[in-house]
Amino acid sequence: MHEITLCQRALELIEQQAAKHGAKRVTGVWLKIGAFSCVETSSLAFCFDLVCRGSVAEGCKLHLEEQEAECWCETCQQYVTLLTQRVRRCPQCHGDMLQIVADDGLQIRRIEIDQE
């Protein structure tokens, strides 16, 4: 389960930004999950709640956005969204010369803080 490690690292960054901006607490966090990150959203939410306990982000609202599996097809020269992450064929021309455009990581998109 690499979700716990991702959450621990995200919390480090969140705490750094909260301190930088004089936050008393973090009230919301928006995370974008890469289409090829192999992250289970339910596990991520559970782990995030767990690692935030006792921190400035305890009890904050977690917003998760899942990125689509976007690729560039060398054969038909267009961006396509894969029907599933497991099938690596272009849905337009059925070619297999795809370059993955979608991320395989986790991004902190936004942090909402309370300064009072």
Swiss-Prot record:
GO terms for biological process: protein maturation; protein modification process; protein-containing complex assembly. Keywords: Cell inner membrane, Cell membrane, Membrane, Metal-binding, Nickel, Zinc. One of its GO terms (cellular component) is plasma membrane. Ni(2+) binds at residue 2. Gene3D superfamilies: 3.30.2320.80. It holds the Pfam family HypA. InterPro entries: Hydgase_Ni_incorp_HypA/HybF_CS, HypA/HybF. It is found in: Cell inner membrane. GO terms for molecular function: identical protein binding; metallochaperone activity; nickel cation binding; zinc ion binding. Disruption phenotype: Disruption of the gene prevents development of hydrogenase 3 activity, does not influence the level of hydrogenase 1 and leads to a considerable increase in hydrogenase 2 activity. HypA-hybF double mutant is completely blocked in maturation of hydrogenases 1, 2 and 3. However, the inclusion of high nickel concentrations in the medium can restore limited activity of all three hydrogenases. Zn(2+) binds at residues 73, 76, 90, 93. GDP-loaded state of HypB enhances HypA-HypB complex formation and nickel transfer. Belongs to the HypA/HybF family. Involved in the maturation of [NiFe] hydrogenases. Required for nickel insertion into the metal center of the hydrogenase. Mediates transfer of nickel, but not zinc, from the low-affinity metal-binding site in the GTPase domain of HypB to HypA. HypA is involved in maturation of hydrogenase 3. It may partially substitute for the function of HybF and vice versa. May act as a scaffold for assembly of the nickel insertion proteins with the hydrogenase precursor protein after delivery of the iron center. Homodimer. Forms complexes with HypB and SlyD, and interacts with HycE, the large subunit of hydrogenase 3. NCBIfam families: hypA, PRK03681.1, PRK12380.1. This is Hydrogenase maturation factor HypA.
